UniProtKB/Swiss-Prot annotation:
The keyword rRNA-binding does not apply. It comes from the Eukaryota. The lineage of its organism: Eukaryota, Metazoa, Chordata, Craniata, Vertebrata. It comes from Xenopus laevis. GO terms for cellular component: core mediator complex; mediator complex. The gene is med8-a. GO terms for molecular function: RNA polymerase II cis-regulatory region sequence-specific DNA binding; transcription coregulator activity. This is Mediator of RNA polymerase II transcription subunit 8-A. Keywords: Activator, Coiled coil, Nucleus, Transcription, Transcription regulation, Ubl conjugation pathway. Residues 1-26, 117-160 form a coiled coil. Component of the Mediator complex, a coactivator involved in the regulated transcription of nearly all RNA polymerase II-dependent genes. Mediator functions as a bridge to convey information from gene-specific regulatory proteins to the basal RNA polymerase II transcription machinery. Mediator is recruited to promoters by direct interactions with regulatory proteins and serves as a scaffold for the assembly of a functional preinitiation complex with RNA polymerase II and the general transcription factors. Belongs to the Mediator complex subunit 8 family. Residues 190-268 are annotated as: Disordered. Component of the Mediator complex. May be part of a multisubunit E3 ubiquitin-protein ligase complex.
Length: 268
């Protein structure tokens, strides 16, 4: 007798512990649904359901254990009923049952479900008994097929989502080419000094380009193109004067206007 009582006490302690864990999980899940619904994600909800499912399976294992006595064979008899408020019952029930009186005892110590629930359970049991083994096997196979198709669709969506994220994160430029382009534009690194075909050859030092710019003074004041024409006019005038001073030759009747070179923009 004492051995059975000890087993019953150990079983009740284990059941109380498991039920307490399930209650805490439910309280936490309900708190999330009520206060954090805007930040909840499906993985978090599924984790909560998985935790509850595992705890319920553990509770079923405790109930189906060989060492667990059949609780349905145990009879619970209230030893004391009082209409007054009981603080100890308040503490044990966490404030849900303040009074253990004749009015609440039938509800809290009832071992049978409500009449409506009991009637519905009988109907479901009768329908299950009418189904043959072959029909039940077909229903199970159909359900398994539907679950497999659903899992395949979920896996396909997950793979497509992963591929889409990889395409979005794929690099579409070459960092080496970008750095080389920036260095060429900013510092002229890697640029060639050769002139394009169809233009003049390399210019001598001090010679102006086609645009009238000196090579050593890029970006500075532009040199007037009239400088070269003035020098040519001076040269032609000198030739004419020398020819006129030589004996035996007729003086040239061409008049040349000699302009001063003081207009040179780079006069020292």
């Amino acid at each position: 007798m004492q051995r059975e009582e000890k087993q019953l006490e150990a079983c009740l302690d284990a059941l109380i512990s498991q039920v307490s864990d399930i209650k805490n999980s439910l309280v936490g899940f309900i708190h999330k649904l009520e206060n954090e619904f805007d930040r909840l994600t499906w993985p978090s909800v599924l984790d909560s359901f998985a935790l509850l499912s595992g705890q319920l399976n553990t509770l079923n294992k405790v109930l189906k254990n060989e060492k667990t006595p059949l609780l349905r064979n145990q009879v619970i008899i209230p030893l004391l009923l009082s209409p007054d408020r009981d603080e100890e019952i308040m503490r044990l029930t966490e404030g849900r049952v303040p009074v253990f009186s004749h009015e609440v005892v039938p509800d809290h110590l009832r071992t049978k479900p409500d009449p409506d629930v009991e009637e519905l359970e009988k109907q479901l049991s009768a329908e299950a008994a009418r189904i043959t083994t072959e029909a039940a096997q077909k229903q199970v196979q159909s359900m398994n097929k539907m679950c497999s198709n659903l899992l395949d669709k979920i896996s396909k969506e997950e793979r497509e989502s992963e591929l889409g994220s990889l395409r979005q994160n794929k690099q579409t430029f070459n960092p080496t080419d970008t750095n080389a382009l920036v260095a060429a534009v900013a510092f002229g690194k890697g640029l060639s000094n050769r002139r394009p075909p169809g233009q003049g050859g390399p210019m001598a030092p001090g010679q102006t380009g086609a645009s009238g710019m000196l090579p050593s003074a890029a970006g500075m004041q532009q040199v007037p193109m009239s400088l070269q024409s003035n020098q040519q006019q001076q040269h032609m005038a000198g030739v004419s004067m020398s020819q006129g001073n030589q004996p035996g030759k007729m003086p040239s009747s061409i008049k040349t206007n000699i302009k001063s070179a003081s207009m040179h923009p780079y006069q020292r």
